[in-house]
Amino acid sequence: MDPAASPAAAPPAAPAAAPAADPAADPAAALPGQALAQAPALAQINGQEGARNERAAYLWRPWLSSINDQPRQARSLVDWADNRATAAEAAKTDSDFHHPVRLYWPKSHSFDYLYSAGEILLNNFPVQATINLYEDSDSADNEEDKEEEEEEEEEEDDEEEEEDEDKDVNENEPEVCMGVSEATTHKATAHSPDPHSACPN
């Protein structure tokens, strides 16, 4: 069998033949002990205080980076040190959102949320979020306006009902005094509580 014809039979490349890792390209790989030395710093960044607060180490905080992602964090720490950035600035650049993300939406627009805009907003939002409704000045004004409008409508309805009752009463009364002289009509209208009625009764 020809050794050149069988690529599977070729021995793997020796580890010594691999190119040497460039320490400047990957600082975490260049200093393996440094990642372990920075573990307390990583624990503090992640909100875990180590031995002082053991219970906090077991709580899952999705808004903080995972402690299991140490190589990425070690690289980030080295990059921060190179750029002279503070830990707060670095945490801010690492993630723009801190979970739980809450989007505040005015109650006056809650109808819009239920039927279109809020659903579209949540679907297009880059992270999981919840919408919290808040009292805005518009919604308080709208409630007062609605109450005033309801009161006005009730008053108008009451007035219309009274007018309808008056018309019904006037239409149902027979007019008895059609042939009364002008003098008596004048006298009757002077004492009559209803000026439209020509009857003295």
Swiss-Prot record:
Job description of the protein: Plays a role in somitogenesis. Essential for transcriptional repression of the segmental patterning genes, thus terminating the segmentation program in the presomitic mesoderm, and also required for the maintenance of rostrocaudal polarity in somites.
Bias (Low complexity) ranges: 15-29
Tissues where the protein occurs: Expressed in the anterior presomitic mesoderm and somites of stage E9.5 dpc embryos. Also expressed in tongue, diaphragm and intercostal muscles at 16.5 dpc.
Residues spanned by motif WRPW motif: 57-60
Any one Gene Ontology cellular component term annotated for this protein: nucleus
Main location group: nucleus
Name the record gives this protein: Protein ripply1
Keywords, in A-Z order: Developmental protein, Nucleus, Repressor, Transcription, Transcription regulation
One Pfam family hit: Ripply
Tagged with keyword Nucleus: yes
Location of the region described as Disordered in the Swiss-Prot/TrEMBL record: 1-29, 136-201
UniProt free text on domains: The ripply homology domain is required for transcriptional repression.
Compartment annotation: Nucleus
Transcription regulation listed as a keyword: yes
